[in-house]
């Protein structure tokens, strides 16, 4: 998860990472000016950053002079997942949680979004659950909410300053109240905003917490405690 800025943040590095993230999450090749518009940076600066990323092989330029992920980005992603051991440790635990017949998910918080490393509905092969969903707003996600609750109110306020907050029409005070409730419970229970009347139950893992595990589906209140117990056990083993 993102930490608060230190005394001397490197703005050039921050801009480079913002450019890298925007490129990584774009579903199709994107031009320099459009990418600059998305992240609110000067096109000249973004052009220099993209050319540097292309030189490093992290980005690549298409025939029509747009940019997309290069081989270096995929190598970095694979190396980080392999070196951390997170997926290797998580897969057996996630597979065990599928016994409840609900969707099983593993994700991490990045700014105001959640990136799902694993998301498998009932009946889906576990291998197909890897990387099948991209970014989602943290406040509509059980994993996002339980990881936001690990942050202090000041940090959460800085993330959402001047922004509309999905699922929280009354804004920041409503979100902070919900996060306080999650901290007290030790888990998140989030209603899915559609007509299925589904809920998500999620817990955090790690010390400090850096990843979330969740079950989602038709989960009545009375069915929540055993799911929380199973999630906590999985989170404990994942954090070892």
Provide a role label for each language-model segment.
Residues 60, 105-107, 190:
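Conserved beta-strand cores of small sensory beta-sandwich domains that regulate signal transduction
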Residues 15, 45, 89, 174, ...:
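Charged catalytic carboxylate motif
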Residues 65-161:
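Amphipathic alpha-helical effector-binding/dimerization core
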Residues 168-239:
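Extended hydrophobic
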Residues 22, 49, 88-100, 181, ...:
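Amphipathic alpha-helical regulatory segments at dimerization interfaces
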Residues 24, 148, 152, 232-240:
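Short amphipathic alpha-helical signal-transduction/dimerization elements
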Residues 1-83, 239-240:
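N-terminal helix-turn-helix
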């Amino acid at each position: 998860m993102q930490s608060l800025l230190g005394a001397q943040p490197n703005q050039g590095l921050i801009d480079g990472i913002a450019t890298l993230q925007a490129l990584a999450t774009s579903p199709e090749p994107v031009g320099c000016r459009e990418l600059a518009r998305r992240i609110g940076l000067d096109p000249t600066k973004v052009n220099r950053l993209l050319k540097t990323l292309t030189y490093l092989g992290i980005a690549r330029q298409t025939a029509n002079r747009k940019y997309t992920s290069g081989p270096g980005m995929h190598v970095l992603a694979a190396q980080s997942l392999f070196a951390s051991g997170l997926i290797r440790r998580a897969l057996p635990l996630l597979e065990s949680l599928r016994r409840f017949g609900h969707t099983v998910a593993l994700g991490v918080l990045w700014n105001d979004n959640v990136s799902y490393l694993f998301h498998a509905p009932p009946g889906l092969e576990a291998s197909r659950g890897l990387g099948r969903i991209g970014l989602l707003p943290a406040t509509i996600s059980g994993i996002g909410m339980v990881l936001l609750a690990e942050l202090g109110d000041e940090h959460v306020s800085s993330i959402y300053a001047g922004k509309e907050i999905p699922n929280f029409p009354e804004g920041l005070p409503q979100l902070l109240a919900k996060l306080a409730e999650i901290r007290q419970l030790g888990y998140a229970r989030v209603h899915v905003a559609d007509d299925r009347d589904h809920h998500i139950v999620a817990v955090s893992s790690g010390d400090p917490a850096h990843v979330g595990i969740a079950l989602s589906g038709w989960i009545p209140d009375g069915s929540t405690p055993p799911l929380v117990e199973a999630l906590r056990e999985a989170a404990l083993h994942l954090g070892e």
